[in-house]
Amino acid sequence: MTKKLYIKTWGCQMNEYDSEKMADLLDSTHGFSAAQSAEEADVILLNTCSIREKAQEKVFHQLGRWKTLKQDKPELIIGVGGCVASQEGDTIRQRAPFVDLVFGPQTLHRLPEMINELKGGAKSVIDVSFPEIEKFDRLPEPRAEGPTAFVSIMEGCSKYCTFCVVPYTRGEEVSRPVDDVLLEIAQLAGQGVREVNLLGQNVNAYRGENYDGTICRFSELLELVAAIDGIDRIRYTTSHPVEFTDDIIDAYASIPELVDHLHLPVQSGSDRILNLMKRGHTALEYKSKMRKLKKIRPNISLSSDFIIGFPGETDADFEATMDLIQAVDYDLSFSFIYSARPGTPAADAVDDVTEETKKQRLHLLQQRITQQALRIARHMVGTEQRILVEGPSKKNPMELSGRTENNRVVNFEGTPDMIGEFVDVNITDVFTNSLRGEVVRRESEMGLRVAVSPQSIMAKHQADMPDELGVGQFSPA
């Protein structure tokens, strides 16, 4: 009888990527198939996030709901992974002794061995170590699910912003080798993926090793990814302003596959608060980078993260943030009320901004962003936009839905054979969370460029594998 696996995922896109890899890994090693609910599973994994307030308590509340499942089915395996697991470690077992597995973001590749240890008689297994990039060497070939895919190119962050737990939960920055990244993307392109989203906690800081030992910068990686036939769109997240350097800005002039959308978290528009956060830049430096980018891509859509009510934030500091929002003209934000993260330097500061003030400021910020977003969307009416068709519309399953380069959902009438392809549409109407359009051109009329076939990259990787004598051979594909 097929064993069932249930994974509950909280948090960022990196966690979503990790959960997909866990599922693929346990399918390839143990034959686990996906369960639709925790009740029908043989293994339950909770992939946690420590960014939001009271993340630890949220984990234990969820585990409490699963405790009865363990009582009814003693052979059930319950595991906790992700950033809270990395932070809490043994504490999870102390508070929830029925948990069998505790593993960090960098040790998910060891899940098959951990499960085998439990089946061999171990009472529990805990591994929250940081074995750098090892996990990517142990993961199975990626499986595409639709025309878009995430690809992790690096892990961790070395910036140590005073409010952030990432360096403590995912470790410092470690980049995957260039060939490994290109192979994964080529494999996905061979399965029909058209758009890749390159992931990392500080993705612009990518410094991957080339086959000859030299280092590849992020801008150089973008060129290599864009050259793969079938990959016609490139997104990436998350970035840090300090690492958003001129060579990356220049890439927007030479790489048409880079979409007209950038998510570049600034957190605050106040230099005083930015200094307290240890962000390493000023508001003026940030705006200068955005001006350079807009000279190359005048229509680029910009989004950001904002922390509201950081310790010591005054009315003047908040007004500086509002001024920055207007100057940059964001049309989307991920904004959060500040709450201390245990173990971070900011947690020792006095949280002197009242909850009422935080909520008022958050409302004003989101109101301004919404106004700007609506204005930008209205300006798109009558324009022609290229859409990657992702599938049926959520609003009307008889219609299709896709995204523009600037990450807006467009619903339109089309045929099922358009799914996975690009279409050009004329934008006819604007709604709160979507646009409406009419198809004017299909992909066969676009003349999308071809540079390097996915098959040639995969063939090169296979040719580089050592023979029986341990000697690697290379012949051009």
From Swiss-Prot:
<protein>
    <recommendedName>
        <fullName>tRNA-2-methylthio-N(6)-dimethylallyladenosine synthase</fullName>
        <ecNumber>2.8.4.3</ecNumber>
    </recommendedName>
</protein>
<dbReference type="InterPro" id="IPR006638">
    <property type="entry name" value="Elp3/MiaA/NifB-like_rSAM"/>
</dbReference>
<keyword id="KW-0411">Iron-sulfur</keyword>
<keyword id="KW-0479">Metal-binding</keyword>
<dbReference type="InterPro" id="IPR002792">
    <property type="entry name" value="TRAM_dom"/>
</dbReference>
<dbReference type="GO" id="GO:0051539">
    <property type="term" value="F:4 iron, 4 sulfur cluster binding"/>
</dbReference>
<dbReference type="GO" id="GO:0005829">
    <property type="term" value="C:cytosol"/>
</dbReference>
<dbReference type="InterPro" id="IPR006463">
    <property type="entry name" value="MiaB_methiolase"/>
</dbReference>
<dbReference type="InterPro" id="IPR038135">
    <property type="entry name" value="Methylthiotransferase_N_sf"/>
</dbReference>
<keyword id="KW-0819">tRNA processing</keyword>
<feature type="binding site">
    <location>
        <position position="161"/>
    </location>
    <ligand>
        <name>[4Fe-4S] cluster 2</name>
    </ligand>
</feature>
<feature type="binding site">
    <location>
        <position position="157"/>
    </location>
    <ligand>
        <name>[4Fe-4S] cluster 2</name>
    </ligand>
</feature>
<dbReference type="GO" id="GO:0046872">
    <property type="term" value="F:metal ion binding"/>
</dbReference>
<feature type="binding site">
    <location>
        <position position="83"/>
    </location>
    <ligand>
        <name>[4Fe-4S] cluster 1</name>
    </ligand>
</feature>
<dbReference type="Pfam" id="PF00919">
    <property type="entry name" value="UPF0004"/>
</dbReference>
<dbReference type="Pfam" id="PF04055">
    <property type="entry name" value="Radical_SAM"/>
</dbReference>
<dbReference type="GO" id="GO:0035597">
    <property type="term" value="F:N6-isopentenyladenosine methylthiotransferase activity"/>
</dbReference>
<dbReference type="Pfam" id="PF01938">
    <property type="entry name" value="TRAM"/>
</dbReference>
<feature type="binding site">
    <location>
        <position position="49"/>
    </location>
    <ligand>
        <name>[4Fe-4S] cluster 1</name>
    </ligand>
</feature>
<dbReference type="InterPro" id="IPR013848">
    <property type="entry name" value="Methylthiotransferase_N"/>
</dbReference>
<feature type="binding site">
    <location>
        <position position="164"/>
    </location>
    <ligand>
        <name>[4Fe-4S] cluster 2</name>
    </ligand>
</feature>
<comment type="subunit">
    <text>Monomer.</text>
</comment>
<keyword id="KW-0408">Iron</keyword>
<feature type="domain" description="TRAM">
    <location>
        <begin position="378"/>
        <end position="441"/>
    </location>
</feature>
<comment type="similarity">
    <text>Belongs to the methylthiotransferase family. MiaB subfamily.</text>
</comment>
<feature type="binding site">
    <location>
        <position position="12"/>
    </location>
    <ligand>
        <name>[4Fe-4S] cluster 1</name>
    </ligand>
</feature>
<dbReference type="InterPro" id="IPR007197">
    <property type="entry name" value="rSAM"/>
</dbReference>
<keyword id="KW-0949">S-adenosyl-L-methionine</keyword>
<dbReference type="InterPro" id="IPR023404">
    <property type="entry name" value="rSAM_horseshoe"/>
</dbReference>
<dbReference type="InterPro" id="IPR020612">
    <property type="entry name" value="Methylthiotransferase_CS"/>
</dbReference>
<dbReference type="InterPro" id="IPR005839">
    <property type="entry name" value="Methylthiotransferase"/>
</dbReference>
<keyword id="KW-0808">Transferase</keyword>
<comment type="function">
    <text>Catalyzes the methylthiolation of N6-(dimethylallyl)adenosine (i(6)A), leading to the formation of 2-methylthio-N6-(dimethylallyl)adenosine (ms(2)i(6)A) at position 37 in tRNAs that read codons beginning with uridine.</text>
</comment>
<keyword id="KW-0963">Cytoplasm</keyword>
<feature type="domain" description="MTTase N-terminal">
    <location>
        <begin position="3"/>
        <end position="120"/>
    </location>
</feature>
<keyword id="KW-0004">4Fe-4S</keyword>
<feature type="domain" description="Radical SAM core">
    <location>
        <begin position="143"/>
        <end position="375"/>
    </location>
</feature>
